[in-house]
Design a protein with these regions (language model features):
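Transmembrane helical core of 7TM receptor-like proteins
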Residues: 1-165
Length: 165
């Protein structure tokens, strides 16, 4: 299972790089730093989904290591192929609906005035700066989702490694 999880981390990093690097290299090569609103939304959505996947995969990996170290005799039974696949698939699809909804909420804001972002890729704070309406509710929702998607896996990792020590 460990190598399967590491393979998923490798795929995740390839996806991260494929999401941001082509546009960045094109912009640097052509000196034309433009991106459509739809492309910006797609890029942001992919970055958010991949970030959620990374957090979940880290928690799954911590659980895998906990089981391997603390219950080595039960490890093959608990972390069998089916369970490993389910945990990884859950990690990959767990954040999709939330992050798509969050991206839709952010890009539903009214935009007026300048349409320039001073950033290498489409990220949430620069997009909020472009919005001309009240972004408070959206910002609170972003922070709530960020806390949930980062803190819950972090606490699971902490508990797993705490039990190992």
């Amino acid at each position: 299972p460990m190598y399967f999880l590491l393979g998923n981390f490798s795929l995740l990093e390839i996806c991260y790089v494929s999401t941001t690097l082509p546009r960045m290299l094109t912009n640097l090569w052509t000196q034309r730093r433009t991106i459509s609103l739809a492309a910006c939304a797609a890029q942001m959505c992919w970055i958010l989904m991949l970030g959620a996947t990374e957090c979940f995969l880290l928690a799954v990996m911590a659980y895998d290591r906990y089981m391997a170290i603390c219950s080595p005799l039960h490890y093959p039974l608990v972390m069998n192929y089916k369970v490993c696949i389910q945990l990884v698939v859950g990690s990959w699809i767990g954040g999709i609906p939330v992050q798509i909804g969050q991206t839709f909420q952010i890009f539903s804001l009214p935009f007026c005035g300048s349409n320039l972002i001073n950033h290498f890729f489409c990220d949430i704070p620069p997009i909020f700066k472009l919005a001309c309406g009240n972004t408070f509710v959206n910002e609170v929702m972003v922070y709530i989702v960020a806390v949930l998607f980062v803190m819950v896996p972090f606490l699971l990792i902490l508990v797993s490694y705490g039990r190992i020590i």
